[in-house]
Protein backbone atom coordinates (compact mmCIF):
# COMPACT_ATOMS: atom_id res chain seq x y z
CA UNK A 1 0.00 0.00 0.00
CA UNK A 2 1.28 3.46 -0.86
CA UNK A 3 -0.07 6.91 -0.25
CA UNK A 4 0.22 9.81 2.12
CA UNK A 5 -1.47 8.10 5.03
CA UNK A 6 0.74 5.05 5.16
CA UNK A 7 4.44 4.43 5.49
CA UNK A 8 6.07 1.15 6.35
CA UNK A 9 9.33 2.49 7.71
CA UNK A 10 9.12 6.19 8.58
CA UNK A 11 9.89 7.03 12.20
CA UNK A 12 9.79 10.01 14.48
CA UNK A 13 13.49 10.66 14.00
CA UNK A 14 14.19 10.61 10.27
CA UNK A 15 16.30 13.74 10.69
CA UNK A 16 18.74 11.90 12.96
CA UNK A 17 20.16 10.43 9.75
CA UNK A 18 19.62 13.32 7.32
CA UNK A 19 22.12 11.96 4.82
CA UNK A 20 19.84 9.01 3.99
CA UNK A 21 16.43 9.90 5.41
CA UNK A 22 14.57 8.85 2.26
CA UNK A 23 15.83 5.28 2.65
CA UNK A 24 13.55 4.92 5.67
CA UNK A 25 10.37 5.82 3.79
CA UNK A 26 7.93 3.50 2.05
CA UNK A 27 9.35 3.49 -1.48
CA UNK A 28 5.86 3.10 -2.90
CA UNK A 29 5.21 6.74 -2.07
CA UNK A 30 5.04 9.17 -4.95
CA UNK A 31 7.51 12.03 -4.65
CA UNK A 32 4.55 14.39 -4.47
CA UNK A 33 3.48 12.64 -1.24
CA UNK A 34 6.85 13.17 0.43
CA UNK A 35 7.62 16.30 2.43
CA UNK A 36 10.87 17.50 0.86
CA UNK A 37 13.17 20.29 2.06
CA UNK A 38 14.73 22.35 -0.71
CA UNK A 39 17.15 25.23 -1.11
CA UNK A 40 16.41 28.41 -3.06
CA UNK A 41 19.14 29.53 -5.49
CA UNK A 42 21.08 26.55 -4.26
CA UNK A 43 24.40 27.53 -5.84
CA UNK A 44 24.79 30.96 -4.24
CA UNK A 45 27.01 29.65 -1.42
CA UNK A 46 30.06 30.61 -3.50
CA UNK A 47 29.51 34.35 -3.13
CA UNK A 48 32.18 36.15 -1.10
CA UNK A 49 31.62 39.75 -2.15
CA UNK A 50 29.89 41.44 0.84
CA UNK A 51 27.84 43.80 -1.33
CA UNK A 52 26.54 41.13 -3.71
CA UNK A 53 25.99 38.75 -0.80
CA UNK A 54 23.46 41.07 0.84
CA UNK A 55 20.95 40.45 -1.95
CA UNK A 56 22.26 37.51 -4.02
CA UNK A 57 23.58 35.04 -1.43
CA UNK A 58 20.84 32.71 -0.21
CA UNK A 59 22.88 29.69 0.95
CA UNK A 60 26.04 29.26 3.01
CA UNK A 61 26.62 25.53 2.51
CA UNK A 62 27.98 23.81 -0.59
CA UNK A 63 25.97 21.26 -2.54
CA UNK A 64 27.32 18.17 -0.80
CA UNK A 65 26.82 19.68 2.65
CA UNK A 66 23.26 20.61 1.73
CA UNK A 67 22.65 17.04 0.57
CA UNK A 68 24.12 15.61 3.77
CA UNK A 69 21.91 17.92 5.83
CA UNK A 70 18.82 16.45 4.14
CA UNK A 71 18.08 18.88 1.29
CA UNK A 72 16.56 17.00 -1.67
CA UNK A 73 15.18 19.80 -3.89
CA UNK A 74 17.77 22.02 -5.57
CA UNK A 75 16.88 25.27 -7.29
CA UNK A 76 19.51 25.61 -10.02
CA UNK A 77 19.49 28.71 -12.21
CA UNK A 78 21.83 29.46 -15.03
CA UNK A 79 23.03 31.32 -18.07
CA UNK A 80 24.12 29.87 -21.39
CA UNK A 81 27.73 31.07 -21.38
CA UNK A 82 28.78 29.01 -24.42
CA UNK A 83 27.19 26.62 -26.90
CA UNK A 84 28.26 23.74 -24.66
CA UNK A 85 28.13 25.27 -21.18
CA UNK A 86 25.65 26.55 -18.61
CA UNK A 87 27.06 28.76 -15.86
CA UNK A 88 25.22 28.89 -12.54
CA UNK A 89 23.75 32.34 -11.85
CA UNK A 90 21.51 34.22 -9.45
CA UNK A 91 20.03 36.72 -11.84
CA UNK A 92 22.90 38.67 -13.35
CA UNK A 93 25.37 37.47 -10.72
CA UNK A 94 27.72 34.68 -11.81
CA UNK A 95 28.18 32.19 -8.97
CA UNK A 96 31.69 31.09 -9.97
CA UNK A 97 30.90 27.56 -11.13
CA UNK A 98 29.23 25.68 -13.94
CA UNK A 99 26.29 23.29 -13.98
CA UNK A 100 28.64 20.33 -14.17
CA UNK A 101 29.74 21.05 -10.59
CA UNK A 102 26.26 20.39 -9.26
CA UNK A 103 25.76 17.29 -11.41
CA UNK A 104 29.15 15.87 -10.40
CA UNK A 105 28.33 16.38 -6.71
CA UNK A 106 24.87 14.86 -7.14
CA UNK A 107 26.34 11.87 -8.97
CA UNK A 108 28.88 11.35 -6.19
CA UNK A 109 26.26 11.69 -3.48
CA UNK A 110 23.72 9.38 -5.08
CA UNK A 111 26.37 6.73 -5.62
CA UNK A 112 27.14 6.90 -1.89
CA UNK A 113 23.45 6.98 -0.90
CA UNK A 114 21.63 5.09 -3.68
CA UNK A 115 18.25 5.09 -1.90
CA UNK A 116 17.97 8.89 -2.03
CA UNK A 117 16.39 10.98 -4.79
CA UNK A 118 17.18 14.56 -5.81
CA UNK A 119 14.69 16.87 -7.50
CA UNK A 120 16.51 19.48 -9.59
CA UNK A 121 14.70 22.61 -10.70
CA UNK A 122 16.35 24.05 -13.81
CA UNK A 123 15.71 27.61 -14.93
CA UNK A 124 17.31 30.15 -17.25
CA UNK A 125 18.02 33.15 -15.02
CA UNK A 126 19.99 35.51 -17.24
CA UNK A 127 20.48 36.32 -20.92
CA UNK A 128 22.75 34.07 -22.93
CA UNK A 129 26.20 35.19 -23.97
CA UNK A 130 26.13 36.99 -27.33
CA UNK A 131 28.18 34.20 -28.95
CA UNK A 132 25.68 31.49 -28.04
CA UNK A 133 23.67 30.14 -30.98
CA UNK A 134 21.62 27.46 -29.19
CA UNK A 135 18.72 27.74 -26.79
CA UNK A 136 19.27 27.25 -23.07
CA UNK A 137 17.15 24.09 -23.12
CA UNK A 138 19.03 22.72 -26.13
CA UNK A 139 22.39 23.17 -24.38
CA UNK A 140 21.07 21.56 -21.21
CA UNK A 141 19.66 18.61 -23.12
CA UNK A 142 22.65 18.00 -25.38
CA UNK A 143 25.57 18.63 -23.02
CA UNK A 144 24.16 17.60 -19.65
CA UNK A 145 20.95 15.56 -19.75
CA UNK A 146 22.10 13.33 -22.62
CA UNK A 147 25.81 13.45 -21.78
CA UNK A 148 27.31 9.94 -21.41
CA UNK A 149 29.15 11.28 -18.34
CA UNK A 150 25.78 11.49 -16.62
CA UNK A 151 24.30 8.32 -18.08
CA UNK A 152 21.69 6.86 -15.71
CA UNK A 153 21.88 9.91 -13.43
CA UNK A 154 18.56 11.39 -14.55
CA UNK A 155 15.18 9.76 -14.18
CA UNK A 156 14.02 9.06 -17.74
CA UNK A 157 10.86 7.07 -17.06
CA UNK A 158 7.43 7.81 -18.47
CA UNK A 159 5.56 8.08 -15.16
CA UNK A 160 4.51 11.71 -14.75
CA UNK A 161 4.29 11.20 -10.99
CA UNK A 162 7.01 8.68 -10.18
CA UNK A 163 7.45 6.83 -6.91
CA UNK A 164 10.51 6.82 -4.73
CA UNK A 165 11.19 3.26 -5.86
CA UNK A 166 11.36 4.43 -9.49
CA UNK A 167 13.67 7.36 -8.77
CA UNK A 168 16.13 6.00 -6.20
CA UNK A 169 19.67 7.07 -7.01
CA UNK A 170 18.52 9.56 -9.63
CA UNK A 171 17.84 13.22 -10.32
CA UNK A 172 14.27 14.04 -11.26
CA UNK A 173 14.04 17.17 -13.39
CA UNK A 174 11.65 19.97 -12.41
CA UNK A 175 11.68 21.83 -15.69
CA UNK A 176 11.41 25.62 -15.59
CA UNK A 177 13.16 26.07 -18.94
CA UNK A 178 9.97 26.34 -20.96
CA UNK A 179 8.91 24.05 -23.78
CA UNK A 180 11.16 21.05 -24.00
CA UNK A 181 12.03 17.87 -25.84
CA UNK A 182 12.75 16.18 -22.51
CA UNK A 183 9.91 13.78 -21.82
CA UNK A 184 10.57 12.87 -18.17
CA UNK A 185 10.22 14.72 -14.89
CA UNK A 186 7.93 17.54 -13.80
CA UNK A 187 7.02 19.92 -16.60
CA UNK A 188 7.73 17.33 -19.28
CA UNK A 189 5.53 18.62 -22.07
CA UNK A 190 5.83 21.04 -24.96
CA UNK A 191 4.49 24.00 -22.99
CA UNK A 192 6.67 23.45 -19.93
CA UNK A 193 5.69 25.04 -16.60
CA UNK A 194 3.89 28.37 -16.88
CA UNK A 195 5.28 30.22 -13.86
CA UNK A 196 3.43 33.28 -12.56
CA UNK A 197 5.68 36.03 -11.21
CA UNK A 198 5.54 36.95 -7.52
CA UNK A 199 2.36 35.00 -6.93
CA UNK A 200 0.53 32.09 -5.39
CA UNK A 201 -0.88 30.15 -8.32
CA UNK A 202 -2.03 26.82 -9.71
CA UNK A 203 -1.29 25.39 -13.13
CA UNK A 204 -1.53 22.07 -14.97
CA UNK A 205 1.71 20.34 -15.93
CA UNK A 206 2.73 17.14 -17.71
CA UNK A 207 -0.04 17.49 -20.28
CA UNK A 208 -2.63 18.04 -17.59
CA UNK A 209 -1.91 14.96 -15.50
CA UNK A 210 -0.55 16.90 -12.50
CA UNK A 211 -1.73 20.01 -10.67
CA UNK A 212 1.12 22.29 -9.60
CA UNK A 213 0.31 24.52 -6.61
CA UNK A 214 2.97 27.16 -5.95
CA UNK A 215 3.58 29.97 -3.50
CA UNK A 216 6.43 32.19 -4.72
CA UNK A 217 5.58 35.67 -3.43
CA UNK A 218 9.18 36.80 -3.25
CA UNK A 219 8.43 40.53 -3.07
CA UNK A 220 6.50 40.24 0.20
CA UNK A 221 7.70 41.54 3.54
CA UNK A 222 7.91 39.33 6.61
CA UNK A 223 4.29 39.20 7.86
CA UNK A 224 2.70 38.83 4.44
CA UNK A 225 5.25 36.22 3.37
CA UNK A 226 4.71 34.12 6.49
CA UNK A 227 0.96 34.30 5.90
CA UNK A 228 1.38 33.17 2.28
CA UNK A 229 3.57 30.22 3.29
CA UNK A 230 1.16 29.16 6.03
CA UNK A 231 -1.83 29.41 3.70
CA UNK A 232 -0.33 26.91 1.26
CA UNK A 233 0.80 24.70 4.15
CA UNK A 234 -2.79 24.60 5.38
CA UNK A 235 -4.03 23.51 1.95
CA UNK A 236 -1.39 20.79 1.68
CA UNK A 237 -2.20 19.51 5.17
CA UNK A 238 -5.76 18.54 4.22
CA UNK A 239 -5.02 17.31 0.69
CA UNK A 240 -4.44 13.60 0.04
CA UNK A 241 -4.43 13.83 -3.77
CA UNK A 242 -1.09 12.47 -4.96
CA UNK A 243 -1.42 14.28 -8.28
CA UNK A 244 -1.20 17.67 -6.58
CA UNK A 245 2.36 19.03 -6.39
CA UNK A 246 2.93 21.61 -3.64
CA UNK A 247 5.96 23.91 -4.00
CA UNK A 248 6.20 26.53 -1.26
CA UNK A 249 9.01 29.12 -1.36
CA UNK A 250 10.06 30.73 1.95
CA UNK A 251 12.47 33.09 0.17
CA UNK A 252 12.08 36.86 -0.02
CA UNK A 253 14.04 39.21 -2.28
CA UNK A 254 16.56 41.32 -0.42
CA UNK A 255 15.97 45.02 0.02
CA UNK A 256 19.69 45.67 -0.42
CA UNK A 257 20.74 46.31 3.18
CA UNK A 258 21.78 44.13 6.11
CA UNK A 259 18.45 44.88 7.79
CA UNK A 260 16.42 43.39 4.95
CA UNK A 261 18.97 40.96 3.51
CA UNK A 262 18.09 37.40 2.50
CA UNK A 263 19.86 36.20 5.66
CA UNK A 264 17.86 38.50 7.93
CA UNK A 265 14.57 37.45 6.36
CA UNK A 266 15.50 33.77 6.68
CA UNK A 267 16.45 34.23 10.34
CA UNK A 268 12.84 35.19 11.06
CA UNK A 269 10.86 33.19 8.48
CA UNK A 270 12.58 29.80 8.79
CA UNK A 271 12.09 29.40 12.57
CA UNK A 272 8.48 30.61 12.37
CA UNK A 273 7.56 28.10 9.67
CA UNK A 274 9.55 25.35 11.42
CA UNK A 275 7.41 25.98 14.51
CA UNK A 276 4.23 25.66 12.44
CA UNK A 277 5.36 22.42 10.81
CA UNK A 278 6.30 20.98 14.20
CA UNK A 279 2.89 21.92 15.63
CA UNK A 280 1.12 20.25 12.69
CA UNK A 281 2.82 16.94 13.46
CA UNK A 282 2.76 14.19 10.85
CA UNK A 283 1.04 16.11 8.08
CA UNK A 284 1.64 16.84 4.43
CA UNK A 285 3.70 19.96 3.76
CA UNK A 286 4.73 19.51 0.14
CA UNK A 287 8.13 20.74 -0.96
CA UNK A 288 9.41 23.76 0.96
CA UNK A 289 12.19 25.80 -0.63
CA UNK A 290 14.20 27.84 1.86
CA UNK A 291 17.08 30.26 2.14
CA UNK A 292 20.03 29.20 4.31
CA UNK A 293 19.00 25.55 4.30
CA UNK A 294 20.73 23.66 7.09
CA UNK A 295 21.54 26.83 9.00
CA UNK A 296 20.20 26.69 12.55
CA UNK A 297 19.64 29.78 14.65
CA UNK A 298 20.38 29.12 18.36
CA UNK A 299 17.26 28.37 20.36
CA UNK A 300 15.08 27.67 17.33
CA UNK A 301 14.00 24.53 15.51
CA UNK A 302 15.81 23.64 12.29
CA UNK A 303 13.40 23.87 9.39
CA UNK A 304 15.06 21.16 7.29
CA UNK A 305 14.81 18.71 10.19
CA UNK A 306 11.19 19.63 10.88
CA UNK A 307 10.23 19.08 7.23
CA UNK A 308 11.95 15.69 7.19
CA UNK A 309 10.38 14.60 10.48
CA UNK A 310 6.89 15.61 9.37
CA UNK A 311 6.85 12.65 6.97
CA UNK A 312 4.67 9.71 7.98
UniProtKB/Swiss-Prot annotation:
Keyword flag Lyase: yes
Matching InterPro entries: PI-PLC_domain, PLC-like_Pdiesterase_TIM-brl, PLipase_C_PInositol-sp_X_dom
GO terms for MF: phosphatidylinositol diacylglycerol-lyase activity; phosphoric diester hydrolase activity
A GO cellular component annotation in the UniProt record: extracellular region
One GO BP annotation of this record: lipid catabolic process
Compartment list: Secreted
Gene3D superfamilies per UniProt: Phosphatidylinositol (PI) phosphodiesterase
Reactions performed catalytically: a 1,2-diacyl-sn-glycero-3-phospho-(1D-myo-inositol) = 1D-myo-inositol 1,2-cyclic phosphate + a 1,2-diacyl-sn-glycerol
Keywords: Lipid degradation, Lipid metabolism, Lyase, Secreted, Signal, Virulence
PI-PLC X-box domain mapped to chain residues: 27-176
E.C. number: 4.6.1.13
Active-site residues (renumbered): 40 (proton acceptor), 90 (proton donor)
SMART domains with a match to the protein in the record: PLCXc
Keyword Kinase set for record: no
Span of the signal peptide: 1-26
Primary role: Cleaves glycosylphosphatidylinositol (GPI) and phosphatidylinositol (PI) anchors but not PI phosphates. Potential virulence factor.
Name used for this protein in its record: 1-phosphatidylinositol phosphodiesterase
Amino acid sequence: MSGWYHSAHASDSLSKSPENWMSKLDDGKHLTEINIPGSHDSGSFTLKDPVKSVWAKTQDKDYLTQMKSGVRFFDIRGRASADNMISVHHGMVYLHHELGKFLDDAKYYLSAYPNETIVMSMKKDYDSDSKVTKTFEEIFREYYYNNPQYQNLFYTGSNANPTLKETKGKIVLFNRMGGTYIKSGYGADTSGIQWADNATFETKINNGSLNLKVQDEYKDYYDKKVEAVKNLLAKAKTDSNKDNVYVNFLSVASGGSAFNSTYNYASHINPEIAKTIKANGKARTGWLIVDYAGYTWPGYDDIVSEIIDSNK
